[in-house]
Design a protein with these regions (language model features):
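Alpha-helical bundle regulatory/interaction domains
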Residues: 1-183
Length: 185
């Protein structure tokens, strides 16, 4: 019988966004690592779309393309990547929000190429400080999985409401990148 509680040391949950947000957000994901003290989970992430990760207890160290591991800020924005990212995580929880190119364009006027293959502190980088309410949807202590997810979705709905400049052009780019006829770009 399942109790609904995660088994083992790592629980990773994915949530599809509501249909109105799917052109902008790939998924929301919640990672929780259980353990004692400095027990570490280590892994590598494949190249991916841009994303925002909120790590309330700053329990994740990461590096890109073989670079040194650094302790990530509480809210980290990552541009699209073409390299692997190596990470180590201590017990704690985090949320991630995968961003499609139009999602990035609606959340920031910063060109993605300025953030490609790197991360920035979303709470101090001037291009992202307006995301404070979104980052604040995940408190230091757990507010409960459903409550945090719903708070993130409320903030995303507000932030993604206005079209971005050149959105039609960005959509054509997205469609080309996700066309199943092409296997590499």
């Amino acid at each position: 019988m399942s109790t609904g509680q995660p088994s083992g040391a790592v629980a990773l949950r994915f949530f599809l966004p509501p249909k109105r947000l799917r052109p902008f957000v790939t998924t929301l994901y919640h990672l929780e690592i259980f353990g004692e003290g400095d027990e570490l989970v280590e892994d590598w992430l494949h190249p991916e779309w841009a994303n925002l990760r909120i790590i309330p207890q700053r329990t994740i160290d990461a590096g890109m393309a073989g670079g040194p591991l650094e302790n990530l800020p509480r809210a980290v924005i990552v541009g699209p990547t073409s390299v692997t990212a190596h990470f180590r995580a201590r017990p704690g929880r985090s949320w991630g929000i995968g961003l499609m190119p139009r999602g990035w364009a609606r959340l920031s006027q910063a060109p993605t190429d300025e953030y490609a293959d790197r991360w920035a502190d979303a709470e101090s980088d001037p291009a992202f400080t307006h995301l404070a309410a979104l980052c604040g949807a995940v408190p230091l202590e757990s507010g409960g999985l459903a409550a945090e997810r719903d708070a993130l979705l409320r903030e995303l709905t507000l932030l993604l409401a206005e079209p971005a400049a050149r959105e039609a052009e960005i959509l054509r780019f997205e469609e080309a990148l996700t066309d199943p006829r092409f296997h590499s770009v």
